A protein has these predicted regions:
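Bacterial N-terminal signal peptides
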Residues: 9-19
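Bacterial N-terminal signal peptides that target proteins for export
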Residues: 1-10
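Long, low-charge, small-residue-enriched segments that form tightly packed helices used
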Residues: 140, 357, 377-575
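Active-site bordering "gate/hinge" segments
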Residues: 20-377, 381, 386-389, 402, ...
Length: 575
């Protein structure tokens, strides 16, 4: 009988090839499993004697990676990278109908005995399941004790409060979500962007009137892992690239003037090319030099056209913030639109939706895109105003009367508590005219009101608003490029020195007509839950009346000596 000997080395080699071909485990899922395991342990065992156990818990790990370059005067000033992981733990005691959540005072109650140490909400940068679980364990313990304290305080306060039969539940019941996003590439050509930043910032040296300037390039990646006792398991990744060109100068009367161009994109390739960046710098220079020579105008009340970006800021400040669901409750809020569902709140030709599911519009990327919000609810298109009639609010998992489910707008920055926030606010109109006709109507309205001119606001830096009940219900916008339109000749002349002010209901109901083309305003919005990326899309607006107040004038002198950068000879010597 002959024995056949099989070669061992080829088998070992084949085995090695099979092993090498096996995909590496997804580190994100490994960490997600660790979070779920620690969550389950706390769900089953966490309970203080003679007190309630949590009825709901969720864990979120938010990992941020950032690269940033800043150049001034042709040189790099900032060359940074940043990487961290932050934890947010939500622990709720009671029930969906009545739990520890409520006004801010409950959030801070329990700051006395037993809470002299607050654990750090950082997560490990290393992919260590045990270290992650340990960090979550410590934060969960602190959050549970605080939740118990808040719950008892809330129950005590209810002894003195009149029962409200229309009081909505404390927390919405949502279906669990399962989603693991494919990893997103995060390239950043450091050398190229350093060169671009240097070259573009160099262009400002030829204009000593612009005494400071900056070119900033950023690349951010946010990875989010979320688990809850309801069964949600979510992994998302988002990237955002930014390029910002800015400069400042002073007018002869001392007023500080600034201008900028800001670009955002979800990919590095989406940022503008070298020529467009150079053109942006040229435009900033030209506009600031023109603003220095422009006359300051007195406060104004009369008709005006708001270009699409400026119109977007108006909708964001005057309408959007007041439709955030969390602002419809609580004694500290003005509740401008509470109880107005089904009623006319805007002109009948205006409709507004907020849609975090839209990545881009007309080729422009939108900052407010996301898959799931910070409470584990899928982002949803929400009709807010339909033909002038209020239909809904932006909703987190904090229910409102008549709105018991979230529509995926619970948003936050870092470790802040999520609240209802805007994402992509999109305004549309059925009363559209072209730009030429819009200007004709502006002139006609100014004549009707006996005004020597109307205004066109073509650019705006942003705005802010007050929604609380402790102050005036007002908003403010900071226009940058304002043009006075002579009613006799139609000639446009640049002016400066004013800010838009107004009350929301009055301002938005003075819209007479809109332009045909929508414009995109990308940026970040700051509120209680931090700074979140947002977009506003709107057409140009013709307002029957707008109020502009005098901006802060400032009487500071410009720098006394010439900048050494602008007075340097070819040999490098300063004159």
């Amino acid at each position: 009988m002959r024995t056949r000997h099989t070669p061992i080395l080829p088998l070992l080699a084949a085995s090695a090839l099979l092993t090498a071909a096996a995909p590496a485990p997804d580190a994100r899922v490994t960490l997600l499993d660790a979070m779920a395991e620690e969550l389950q342990r706390n769900q089953q065992q966490l309970k203080l004697q003679n007190h309630d156990a949590p009825y709901f818990m969720s864990y979120q790990l938010k990992e941020t990676e950032q690269s940033a370059l800043t150049a001034r005067y042709g040189a790099i000033f900032v060359d940074d990278t940043y990487h961290d992981r932050k934890l947010y733990v939500d622990v709720r005691v009671g029930s969906y109908d009545f739990d520890n959540s409520g006004p801010e005072e409950y959030e801070y109650f329990g700051g006395g005995r037993g809470s002299s140490y607050v654990p750090n909400p950082d997560g490990p940068i290393d992919d260590s399941p045990l270290a992650l679980r340990t960090s979550l364990w410590l934060v969960t313990d602190q959050k549970y004790k605080a939740a118990l304290s808040q719950f008892l305080k809330k129950k005590g306060d209810n002894v003195y409060a009149v029962e409200d039969p229309k009081q909505p539940p404390s927390f919405s019941k949502e279906k669990p979500a399962r989603y693991v996003q494919t990893p997103v590439a995060f390239p950043f050509d450091h050398d190229r962007w350093a060169r671009v930043a240097r070259d573009v910032s160099e262009r400002f040296k030829a204009h000593p009137e612009l005494f400071d300037s900056e070119v900033r390039v950023t690349a951010d990646k946010v990875k989010r892992l979320f688990v809850s006792t309801e069964g949600s398991r979510i992994v998302t990744e988002e990237t955002m690239y930014g390029l910002h060109v800015s400069a400042v100068t002073r007018a002869d009367d001392g007023q500080l003037l600034d201008d900028s161009r800001n670009y955002y994109a979800p990919t590095e390739a989406g940022l503008p090319d070298d020529k467009k960046i150079a053109d942006a710098a040229t435009k900033v220079i030209e506009e600031l030099l023109a603003l220095r020579k422009a006359p300051a105008i007195d406060p104004y009340t009369g008709p005006a056209i708001l270009a699409p970006e400026a119109a977007g800021v108006l909708f964001h400040e005057a309408v959007g913030h007041r439709l955030e669901g969390d602002r419809q409750d609580g004694d500290g809020e003005g509740k401008t639109f509470k109880g107005q569902v089904g009623k006319q709140v805007l002109p009948p030709f205006i409709s507004i939706v907020d849609d975090p599911t839209v990545r881009s519009l007309q080729g422009e990327p939108l900052n407010g895109f996301y898959e799931y919000d910070e409470e584990g609810v899928k982002g949803q298109k929400t009709v807010l105003v339909e033909k002038g009639v209020l239909r809904s609010y932006l909703l987190s998992r904090r229910p409102l009367e008549g709105f018991l489910l979230s529509n995926g707008h619970g948003r936050s920055q870092g470790t802040r508590k999520p609240v209802a926030r805007m994402a992509n606010l999109i305004a549309d109109s059925t009363k559209q005219v072209d730009d030429v006709e819009l200007k004709k109507q502006l002139i006609a309205e100014a004549k009707r009101q006996g005004k020597p001119y109307g205004l066109i606001i073509r650019d705006i830096t942003g705005g802010n608003t007050n929604t609380s009940s402790y102050g005036y219900q007002a908003f403010k916008g900071v226009p940058r490029m304002v043009y006075r339109v002579d009613v006799k000749t139609g000639e446009e002349s640049l002016v400066r020195g004013v800010e838009i002010v107004g009350t929301p209901l009055s301002s938005i109901n003075r819209i007479m007509a809109t332009g045909r083309k929508q414009g995109v305003f990308n940026g970040f919005c700051g509120a209680e839950s931090g700074n979140v990326p947002v977009s506003t899309v709107a057409p140009a607006l013709l307002l029957q009346e707008i109020e502009l107040q005098r901006a802060m004038e400032g009487k500071d002198r410009p720098p006394i000596l010439m900048s050494p950068a602008s007075s340097t000879t070819a040999s490098g010597e300063v004159k």
